[in-house]
Swiss-Prot record:
This is 2-amino-3-carboxymuconate-6-semialdehyde decarboxylase. Converts alpha-amino-beta-carboxymuconate-epsilon-semialdehyde (ACMS) to alpha-aminomuconate semialdehyde (AMS). ACMS can be converted non-enzymatically to quinolate (QA), a key precursor of NAD, and a potent endogenous excitotoxin of neuronal cells which is implicated in the pathogenesis of various neurodegenerative disorders. In the presence of ACMSD, ACMS is converted to AMS, a benign catabolite. ACMSD ultimately controls the metabolic fate of tryptophan catabolism along the kynurenine pathway. The gene is ACMSD. Its EC number is 4.1.1.45. It comes from Homo sapiens. InterPro entries: ACMSD, Amidohydro-rel, Metal_Hydrolase. Pfam families: Amidohydro_2. Belongs to the metallo-dependent hydrolases superfamily. ACMSD family. It catalyses: 2-amino-3-carboxymuconate 6-semialdehyde + H(+) = 2-aminomuconate 6-semialdehyde + CO2. Zn(2+) binds at residues 6, 8, 174, 291. GO terms for molecular function: aminocarboxymuconate-semialdehyde decarboxylase activity; hydrolase activity; zinc ion binding.
Amino acid sequence: MKIDIHSHILPKEWPDLKKRFGYGGWVQLQHHSKGEAKLLKDGKVFRVVRENCWDPEVRIREMDQKGVTVQALSTVPVMFSYWAKPEDTLNLCQLLNNDLASTVVSYPRRFVGLGTLPMQAPELAVKEMERCVKELGFPGVQIGTHVNEWDLNAQELFPVYAAAERLKCSLFVHPWDMQMDGRMAKYWLPWLVGMPAETTIAICSMIMGGVFEKFPKLKVCFAHGGGAFPFTVGRISHGFSMRPDLCAQDNPMNPKKYLGSFYTDALVHDPLSLKLLTDVIGKDKVILGTDYPFPLGELEPGKLIESMEEFDEETKNKLKAGNALAFLGLERKQFE
């Protein structure tokens, strides 16, 4: 069994959001040829996607070809829209979550849903989380690595974490809103470097901000192998010990204490990196994730895990499915 914790999906269509809300900045999907569509922001194309981004039957066909049993589906992070008026973001979240739920209901043995929330308005986010869990049956939600000017240690977000803990709602943290201009404008640097940096900041913010200390039952998984964190945790821990005046303002516990307290996906594209990741984060805490259907993802799901001579079969099976089930609070028999 292979369970992919990290895959993205969009509705086939949605209303003109600029017309609906009266201002720009929204993302639209424009179908321009058979099996292909443009993602537009304020009329400018920023990505072309194929039908596997919105058509579940095409997706299942490709999953079968690659041996993927189940995908956890989440929206494309550019849809988060935390910058917008909260009620408008909530409206969009409801649209996305309802569409996602209909896909999951149609194929319950192949898909699980991770909802999206208006995180810039924590009260609304909690209400939509409750709806996602209680009405739509989602085991978790996807959130961004920051919410406008808030990092994930922001006290304003603590009610969201409290609700997630109470509802047993898992959080999948995905980078977004990277710097795109200036020094980052060339070489695809926002995706190659900016995304791992975003994720590293998110992990450090949650650790040093006391989130894992205050909410010990919170289940969190960070995308892209936890960014640079697994490789730099020694530096982070040493710096914490040397400058507690700067690093221990909100939590006196050394960051290394929290290794094993959270999950990451296994999307690192390199055997040495995957070995380090499992050594640092824990073999029980790393989950197959592909970033399907995008080109920076793992094009042969599970191939890297299966190639690891250092891993016994039990470890490989944990990374391919068991750890995902534990993170999501689901049982294998639901998908067999």
